[in-house]
Amino acid sequence: MNWKRLFSGLRGGRDARLTPELRARIQSSFDQAAGDEAHFPSTIDPRIYHVKLIRNHLGDLGGKRVLDAGCGKGRFARVFQEQEPACEIWGLDISEEMLRFVPAGIHTRAGSMTELPFEDGFFDAAYATESLEHAVEIEQAVSELCRVVKPGGRIAIIDKNAEQWGKLPTPEWERWFTRKGLERLLRRHCRQVSSRYISYWEDVEPDGLFLAWLAVK
């Protein structure tokens, strides 16, 4: 697949807006990419540190309602469903084609992270793994993610470090984040916020590409 062509013609930035045209472009791009298992796999290794970090921060998921925001094919949701069948997991993604791959038993909803189709405090917890980078209107997306989590609920975000920009090819709307910048956005809505550098594997020293932000509302 020609990723440069597929994701060309757009410029992200601090003042970027998710116009109807841009939203349609992003949705179409991921709809087309849904069948590319090499770039967008349906599963992940449940041993990666991302899984352990999210699970440890969210705590006991039994009987809880949890949002996977920007879930793609639901690969993280699949792992958490297998680990805790009593957890009610919801996956939201802008691409309906991506949602077709989400495993049975996981609730799905098509939509944007900037306008989550859920009531205030609907979830006990929420996480977003490498999806906030595609939300375009980052401040609004963070606000929405916090809005739908009940007071005392936990939020985990894993995404890329702006200081490493250029290390990977990206669609032109994509945004990476500074550690302190995303902390500031979360602190507007959450009473506890922390962040750390992470690696895919717990015993591998982080190379600075990935950051995790952990919050309690």
Listing of model-derived features with the role each one plays in the protein:
Residues 1-60, 75, 79, 98, 156-179:
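Conserved class I S-adenosyl-L-methionine
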Residues 67, 73-115:
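Class I SAM-dependent methyltransferase SAM/SAH-binding core
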Residues 127:
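A conserved beta-strand element that flanks and buttresses the S-adenosyl-L-methionine
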Residues 130-131:
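Short catalytic micro-motifs in class I SAM-dependent methyltransferases
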Residues 139-151:
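A short glycine-rich, Lys/Arg-flanked "PGG" loop and its adjoining helix->strand segment in the class I
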Residues 175-189:
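Short alpha-helix
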Residues 191-202:
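Conserved S-adenosyl-L-methionine
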